[in-house]
Amino acid sequence: MAKKDGVIEIEGSVIEALPNAMFRVELTNGHKVLAHISGKMRQHYIRILPEDRVIVELSPYDLTRGRIVYRYK
């Protein structure tokens, strides 16, 4: 898979599940962001629950929203 330029990947922990496959994630630096699941994770039916450790991609333009790209096992 090609890496995107300019995205920030950071680890975090899911603190709450919201409607429409959105999640509130607390990052390792203490910030809280709103994140949705990436298309590949949705396609492969990967479930995300509160307290899961995940990797979130953030855009440099809006650091309050992100995309969950990986869930640790």
Swiss-Prot record:
- Pinpoint the S1-like domain residues: 1-73
Q: What is its main location?
A: cytoplasm
List UniProt keywords, sorted A-Z: Cytoplasm, Initiation factor, Protein biosynthesis, RNA-binding, rRNA-binding
Q: Which domain of life is it from?
A: Bacteria
Gene Ontology terms: cellular component: cytosol
Q: Where in the cell is it found?
A: Cytoplasm
Gene Ontology molecular function terms on file:
ribosome binding; rRNA binding; translation initiation factor activity
Q: Which Pfam family is an annotated match for this chain, by its short name? A: eIF-1a
InterPro entries given in the database record: NA-bd_OB-fold, RNA-binding_domain_S1_IF1, TIF_IF1
Q: How does it assemble?
A: Component of the 30S ribosomal translation pre-initiation complex which assembles on the 30S ribosome in the order IF-2 and IF-3, IF-1 and N-formylmethionyl-tRNA(fMet); mRNA recruitment can occur at any time during PIC assembly.
Q: What's this chain's function?
A: One of the essential components for the initiation of protein synthesis. Stabilizes the binding of IF-2 and IF-3 on the 30S subunit to which N-formylmethionyl-tRNA(fMet) subsequently binds. Helps modulate mRNA selection, yielding the 30S pre-initiation complex (PIC). Upon addition of the 50S ribosomal subunit IF-1, IF-2 and IF-3 are released leaving the mature 70S translation initiation complex.
**Entry's family note:** Belongs to the IF-1 family.
Listed name of the protein: Translation initiation factor IF-1
From the broadest rank down, the organism's phylogenetic lineage runs: Bacteria, Bacillati, Actinomycetota, Actinomycetes, Micrococcales
Q: What gene name is listed for this protein?
A: infA
